[in-house]
């Protein structure tokens, strides 16, 4: 259900949304801080905003000639370092109770990154973006198949509104080039969405059984190790990257890391993959807003001023805001 009450038997009592404890760097008040109702959904909302800004940095770096493979490598390595804060028992931290599933989650995360870049590089961005947003519906469908009691009719409606909203936000003007590689774009984007959906549900399920600290840090570390294979694909060495591009890539990778830390933490701790993904789906809306608000600082001139495009973006924004409202109700 979406009102904060949980009936799922795999959820430990200590993780009940009405008595959740969170680290003081997320919510002030120290140990034992309670999180009322659906306040935890502010975490994926923050992640969506940070992702929108971070993506501007990564796109600006790409415009300066930085390979997207370099961006993936840096983001995954920085994320692996950041996730070490969740480990317990230093200097000999607790290890996963089940190594194979955790390594599998790392592989899913890595493959999702690769497929996303391929869909955006070799496909049509205006098609890839809304299809990638279908991750919301895939997560809801997977949870329904697995018998998660939190999936309701409202969840399905909110998920559908999110995908529709992202699709409307991506509609281009009349002068936009015709779509190309449509089937390839859809297949790559769906594959990426499925990988990330599997990762989200896996983190939620394994964290409920073994603890977030024994799952996510090792899964992200696995993705970082796999990312070493991307270095030969980079078009230049790090020291050859222009100073301006380095600034953009560090801003982008840093913010993408921070948003991933918040998002994955919320998935593993609050056990609401459907609601969290619906709220996180607002990143498309925030992306449009950030291009308008600060895009010029990143050399971004994407935003169309065509009235026909503007009305579709207003409709898309309303869909996403409605979806978020349904989740918070």
Where are these regions (language model features)?
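Alpha-helical transmembrane segments and their helix-entry boundary regions
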Residues: 71-72, 102, 125-129, 137, ...
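Transmembrane alpha-helices of multi-pass small-molecule transport proteins
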Residues: 46-58, 63-111, 161-164, 215-238, ...
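Structural motif at transmembrane-helix junctions in multi-pass transporters
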Residues: 64-70, 115-131, 208-214, 262-284
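Small-residue-mediated transmembrane helix hinge/kink sites in multi-pass secondary transporters
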Residues: 59, 117, 143-144, 204, ...
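Loop-to-transmembrane-helix transition segments
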Residues: 39-47, 74, 84-115, 183-194, ...
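Juxtamembrane helix-loop boundary signature in multi-pass membrane transporters
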Residues: 6, 27-45, 127, 137-194, ...
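Membrane-interface helix-cap regions at the ends of transmembrane helices
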Residues: 79-97, 141-145, 167-177, 204-205, ...
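Hydrophobic/small/kink-forming positions within alpha-helical transmembrane segments
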Residues: 52, 106, 110, 137-141, ...
């Amino acid at each position: 259900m979406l009102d904060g009450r949980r009936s799922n038997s795999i959820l430990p009592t200590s993780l009940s949304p009405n008595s959740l404890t969170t680290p003081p760097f997320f919510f002030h008040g120290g140990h034992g801080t309670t999180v009322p109702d659906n306040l935890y959904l502010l975490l994926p909302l923050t992640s969506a905003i940070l992702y929108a800004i971070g993506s501007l940095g990564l796109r600006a770096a790409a415009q300066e000639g930085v390979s997207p493979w370099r961006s993936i490598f840096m983001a995954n390595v920085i994320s692996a370092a950041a996730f070490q804060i969740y480990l317990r028992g230093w200097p000999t931290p607790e290890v996963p109770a089940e190594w194979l599933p955790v390594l599998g989650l790392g592989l899913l995360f890595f493959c999702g990154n690769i497929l996303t870049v391929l869909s955006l590089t070799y496909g049509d961005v205006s098609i890839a973006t809304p299809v990638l947003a279908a991750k919301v519906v895939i997560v809801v469908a997977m949870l329904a198949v697995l018998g998660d009691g939190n999936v309701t009719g409202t969840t399905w409606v909110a998920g559908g509104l999110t995908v529709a909203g992202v699709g409307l936000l991506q509609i281009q003007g009349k002068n936009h080039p015709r779509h190309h590689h449509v089937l390839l774009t859809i297949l790559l984007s769906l594959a990426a969405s499925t990988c990330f959906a599997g990762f989200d549900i896996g983190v939620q399920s394994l964290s409920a059984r073994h603890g977030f600290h024994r799952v996510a840090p090792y899964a992200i570390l696995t993705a970082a190790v796999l990312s070493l294979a991307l270095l030969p694909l980079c078009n230049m060495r790090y020291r050859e990257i222009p100073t301006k591009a380095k600034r953009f890539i560090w801003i982008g990778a840093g913010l993408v890391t921070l948003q991933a830390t918040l998002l994955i933490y919320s998935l593993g701790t609050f056990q609401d993959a459907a609601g969290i993904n619906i709220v996180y789906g607002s990143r498309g809306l925030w992306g449009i807003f950030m291009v308008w608000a600060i895009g010029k600082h990143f050399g971004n001139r994407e935003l169309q001023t065509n009235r026909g495009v503007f009305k579709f973006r207003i409709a898309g924004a309303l869909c996403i805001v409605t979806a978020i409202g349904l989740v918070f109700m």
